[in-house]
Regions:
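N-terminal interaction/assembly modules
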Residues: 1-141
Length: 141
């Protein structure tokens, strides 16, 4: 994966591309703007703009958000809904559920590990929650 800055290619790792996708999903959770506007509003945060992987994954997640949220709901404690999950954790879970369910090119264990790392970086002590939900999801499949 690569982006361009001043005519030069910038190589991104899959982790960096995934982090861009997380940041787009998180940003999108605050507004009802079209995805294109969210991408445009956030592209300056990243050297070379937002990579194609992040844009593609976020677009697919937005298209399947209701289905993904319904899947997440199955693994919440009784009485909980996705609206109770913090915005950062929900963005992380949506990304990981999408990768696990729809992207055969990404091993489940990698999706879980990356999600836990994002949770450690962007949430206050919710990495165990994210890990538990994803573990239950993987065991159910």
């Amino acid at each position: 994966m690569s982006n361009e800055l001043n005519g030069e290619q910038i190589k991104l790792t899959r982790s960096e591309a995934r982090e861009q996708a997380f940041m787009l999903l998180f940003s999108k959770s605050f507004d009802d703007e079209p995805l294109e506007a969210t991408i445009e509003d956030n592209s300056e945060m990243f050297e070379g703009g937002i990579c194609g992987y992040a844009q593609s994954v976020v677009s697919s997640i937005e298209d399947k958000k209701d289905e993904i949220d319904a899947e997440i709901s199955k693994f919440l404690k009784k009485g909980w809904t996705v609206s109770r999950i913090s915005k950062p954790s929900l963005a992380i879970l949506r990304l990981a559920f999408y990768e696990i369910k729809y992207l055969d090119s990404v091993p489940d264990s990698v999706s879980v590990n990356e999600a836990v790392e994002l949770a450690k970086k962007y949430t206050i002590d919710e990495s165990k929650f994210v890990n538990g939900i994803l573990g239950a999801f993987i065991r159910s499949n």
